[in-house]
Swiss-Prot record:
Cited CDD domains: M28_nicalin_like (cd03882)
Ranges facing Cytoplasmic side: 552-572
One GO BP annotation of this record: regulation of signal transduction
Subcellular location: Endoplasmic reticulum membrane
Record membrane topology: Single-pass type I membrane protein
Protein origin, superkingdom: Eukaryota
Record has Phosphoprotein as a keyword: no
Gene designation: ncln
UniProt-recorded name of the protein: BOS complex subunit ncln
Organism: Danio rerio
GO MF assignments: ribosome binding
Role played: Component of the multi-pass translocon (MPT) complex that mediates insertion of multi-pass membrane proteins into the lipid bilayer of membranes. The MPT complex takes over after the SEC61 complex: following membrane insertion of the first few transmembrane segments of proteins by the SEC61 complex, the MPT complex occludes the lateral gate of the SEC61 complex to promote insertion of subsequent transmembrane regions. Antagonizes Nodal signaling and subsequent organization of axial structures during mesodermal patterning.
GO cellular component, one term: endoplasmic reticulum membrane
Signal peptide: 1-35
Keywords on record: Developmental protein, Endoplasmic reticulum, Glycoprotein, Membrane, Signal, Transmembrane, Transmembrane helix
Length: 572
């Protein structure tokens, strides 16, 4: 009898055990390639400015993924694609105390419709103004991350539209993703230095010469520092300043064209943080030294900001220039050059008083205006509130050869043809001022920068491509940064007395505080929900229980099987 029992058991195991094993492996062992995915994530801004806190105050993430379609988001990592992102969905995640928010960006922003780009640019300041302890990250889309998002979205959507039994079954059998960051909690960066660069071209004809100051801030800004490339704001201004340094260094190298003006060039750091570099530079030159070009005879200060696009040009002033002043001369020469050489360009002066009650200044020239130095900002933007000045969407450089081909350009970008035109307008205007050409009877259609002295569009293109090849957020550029070193080298090629100016926040009452952990590695692990372990344990226990009862009552089972399988005797 036991030999027959052994034979029956052996036949049962041959059939059932391999099938059970395969079923078990299918349920708990997904493909190895999909078990985990590692990708880079970029954290939202976190900084303090003049006592106000901005951005996300947390960096640690270890929680399960959901999409915003899920009804319950508490302690979950909420994933959203940029195309589906809205401020209402973001607020929903914060209200439900989400564990984190991950916003997935496309690799090619030009694939996004213009309305989505514009909407997100307008939302970036609101995201930063809403201080939160929820970690907020941005990730660039790839095939694996998109697959994770799609699976998570299907799982999240099914929970809200199914019955309770279906939700329970789906919860027990579905795969989830545990999102984990590898970095530590963010902390304040101590003794961070913001670097600014200064260089000059000394005029000819005496010691007490008037000085023209040309200024551009080189840092970029956006909702995530590691995604802030600042092509137009303010890579365009930096490129123009460097090209002006090259052009006027050539003019100042010949005795006949060596003008009676000092030209002072200043690349300021911390421009996106209320112009901290400019503020300290003015303090050092006006309060702490007697030998400064800023103390004697400043004709005017011209700040260059966001000049890489558009057929509009605006001269922003805090106080309209008086007739007969150098500032008025600059205004009139600008109008002359635009009218005679570039009639397609629309030029206008924009007057806005300095509002000291605001948390931040509107334009860089206001820093000089506070110290009673005559200053302007030249920009193609009509308002300082334009979202294009502070957006991660400002990352594209477009050459004229690509215009009109393929998809239309979306978002802020640099049009090299218009950047070159604006550079020439500024150069021609400055030349007419320092050589006093209008009073000498020179007509406005005379072009000075032609042939060997013309603006080099190829050099402008190289500068913009280099500036936009890496993020230039102030938190990422220490005093030994390759960007700072290269800018210093470029200035040294054309200017004299190139020097650095460092700004460090006061330790007792800092005006600005930066934080670390702005870029991390995130891992998405494929996991089963906790209830799956309970369900699996119940199934295994039931299987073993049935097997135990079958062995204990094998005599009854054997007799039953004999009766079922015994051949029937035919009755005649």
């Amino acid at each position: 009898m036991f030999e027959e029992a052994g034979e029956v058991l052996e036949n049962m195991l041959k059939v059932s055990f391999p099938l059970s094993l395969v079923l078990f492996l299918v349920l708990v062992c997904p493909l190895r390639a999909e078990a985990a995915h590692e990708f880079s994530v970029y954290r939202m801004q976190q900084y303090d400015l003049q006592g106000q806190t901005y951005g996300s105050r947390n960096a640690i993430l270890n929680t399960e993924a959901r999409t915003v379609e899920a009804e319950v988001l508490s302690r979950r990592c909420v994933m959203m694609r940029l195309a589906d992102f809205s401020y209402e969905k973001y607020q929903k995640a914060l209200r439900q105390s989400a564990g984190a928010v991950v916003i997935i960006l496309p690799h090619n922003m030009s694939t996004l419709p213009q309305d989505i780009v514009q909407q997100f640019m307008e939302l970036e300041p609101e995201l930063l103004a809403t201080e939160t302890i929820v970690p907020v990250y941005f990730a660039l889309e790839d095939e694996e991350l998109l697959s994770i998002y799609t699976q998570t979205q299907i799982s999240s959507s099914s929970q809200g539209s199914s019955s309770a039994a279906e939700v329970l079954l789906h919860t027990a059998t579905a795969n989830g993703f545990q999102m984990v960051t590898s970095g530590a909690q963010s902390k304040a960066v101590s003794d961070w230095a913001i670097t600014s660069l200064e260089g000059r071209l000394t005029g000819s004809g005496g010691e007490d010469l008037p000085t023209i100051v040309l200024v551009a801030h080189y840092d970029s800004f956006g909702v995530a520092p590691w995604l802030s490339y600042g092509a137009d704001s303010n890579g365009s201004g930096v490129a123009i300043l460097l090209e002006l340094a090259r052009l006027f260094s050539r003019l100042y190298s010949y005795k006949r064209t060596h003008a009676g003006y000092n030209l002072l060039f200043f690349l300021s750091g911390g421009g996106k943080f209320n112009y901290q570099g400019t503020k300290r530079w003015l303090e050092d030159n006006l309060d702490h030294t007697d030998a400064s070009l800023l103390q004697d005879n400043v004709a005017f200060v011209l700040c260059l900001d966001t000049l890489g696009n558009s057929d509009n040009l605006h001269l922003h002033v805090s106080k309209p220039p008086k007739e007969g002043s150098p500032q008025y001369t600059l205004l009139k020469e600008l109008e002359t050059v635009v009218a005679h050489q570039h009639p397609d360009l629309k030029f206008a002066m924009v007057h806005k008083k300095i509002n000291l009650a605001d948390d931040t200044l509107a334009w860089e020239h206001e820093r000089f205006g506070i110290r009673r130095l005559p200053a302007f900002t030249l920009s193609h933007l009509e308002s300082h509130r334009s979202p294009a000045r502070h957006s991660i969407m400002d990352m594209r450089s477009v050459s004229p050869s690509l215009e009109g081909a393929g998809e239309a350009t979306t978002g802020p970008h640099v049009d090299l043809g218009k950047l070159s035109r604006n550079t020439k307008v500024i150069a021609e205007t400055l030349a007419r001022v320092i050589y006093n050409l209008t009073e000498k009877g020179v007509t406005g259609d005379l072009e000075i920068f032609t042939e060997q002295m013309q603006v080099q569009e190829d050099q402008l293109a190289s500068l913009v491509d280099w500036l936009t090849a890496q993020p230039r957020a102030a938190q990422l550029l220490d005093k030994d940064s390759s960007i700072i070193n290269t800018l210093e080298h470029q200035l040294s090629r054309y200017l004299k007395d190139v020097k650095r100016h460092l700004v460090r926040a006061d330790k007792r009452d800092p005006e600005f505080v930066f934080y670390d952990q702005l870029k991390q590695t995130m891992n998405a692990y494929r996991v089963k929900p906790a209830i799956f372990d309970l369900l699996l344990a119940v199934c295994i226990a039931s299987y073993l229980g049935v097997l135990y009862l079958a062995i204990q009552n094998f005599g009854l089972l054997y007799g039953f099987l004999r009766r079922v399988t015994a051949p029937r005797v035919k009755q005649h």
